[in-house]
């Protein structure tokens, strides 16, 4: 279920996905909600483009640390490529 950040208290949330398009974000929200995950989604900026880099806005999806592995597995099974930190 989509939550506000304060629902998670002082937990350091884990970024699991960056949706670049609204349709993609809405689909992912449905997948996470249907599976019963609590998550936060917030707009933020990322760099995109191959030849011409530009700053874009996407939907950043976060989950609690205890849900990270299960959420990543769910995303992969649903055809999404989870965000991997560098």
Regions found by a protein language model. Give the residues of each.
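Acidic/polar low-complexity segments and flexible, solvent-exposed patches
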Residues: 1-86
């Amino acid at each position: 279920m989509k939550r506000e950040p304060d629902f998670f208290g002082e937990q350091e949330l884990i970024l699991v996905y960056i949706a670049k398009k609204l349709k993609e974000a809405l689909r992912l929200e449905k997948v996470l909600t249907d599976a019963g995950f609590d998550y936060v989604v917030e707009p933020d900026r990322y760099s995109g483009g191959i030849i011409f880099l530009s700053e874009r806005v996407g939907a950043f999806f976060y989950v609690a640390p205890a849900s990270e592995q299960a959420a990543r597995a769910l995303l992969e099974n649903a055809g999404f490529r989870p965000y991997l930190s560098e």
